[in-house]
Amino acid sequence: MTRLAILLSILAIGLILLIINHDTGRTMGLANDQFGQLVSLGAIATLIGAGILQSRHRFGEGLRQIAIWLFVVLALVSAYVYRFELEGFGNRLLAGLIPGRATIITDSEGQQEVVLQKMLNGHFETTATVDGKDISMLVDTGASNIALTYEDAEKIGLDPANLNFIVTVMTANGRAQAAPVMLQEISIGPITRRNIGATVAAKGKLDQSLLGMSFLSTLEMLQMRTDELRLRD
């Protein structure tokens, strides 16, 4: 068996064991991070040992191969150890490229958070799935309920002609009449709420649908930072 085959076998077996035991957090009595370090050290030791055995014939070439494989092993181990940070970086990058995109991060305890990046207008916006349709919504902690524009209500299948606009609400355009409705389902990433109350604003009275406190207050965590908003179910 060549050095490459031995090295790849060690790494493959170690990776398989880490994947199998990912949820338990431990592999062969060690924390997964410690086991990953042990696997990498074993691979490095094997590589160095094989290089020493052949150093009498091709010392320079052996050192070069060792350096290359050391870099590969360290890169793989680093990617595993910092997997959550790399995932978060990738999600933030996508959020910056796609305005309103909700990104999902998983912390070291396995808990998921939805992260929204602040828009250029200074507000937090996201695309929520409402009764099966994607709706652009403005996160508004000052709004007591979820509020849909007249057009978005039509988009999700509601017929405004059959609604009773009996509720008076305050919008950016002043006082307006709104109709109470019940949404079957609203989701932002993995966070889903069913049978939740909302209102539909009269036509032309609301510029953008609002994600209000009737949804936000049900969350375990709502954390606002300078440039991002974190939601946890």
UniProtKB/Swiss-Prot annotation:
GO biological process annotation, one example: proteolysis
Domain of life: Bacteria
Chain segments annotated as transmembrane: 4-24, 35-55, 66-86
Any Gene Ontology CC annotation: plasma membrane
GO molecular function: aspartic-type endopeptidase activity
Signal peptide positions on this chain: none
Subcellular location: Cell membrane
Keyword line: Cell membrane, Membrane, Transmembrane, Transmembrane helix
Bilayer topology: Multi-pass membrane protein
Keyword Transmembrane helix: yes
Name under which the protein is recorded: Uncharacterized protein in cobV 5'region
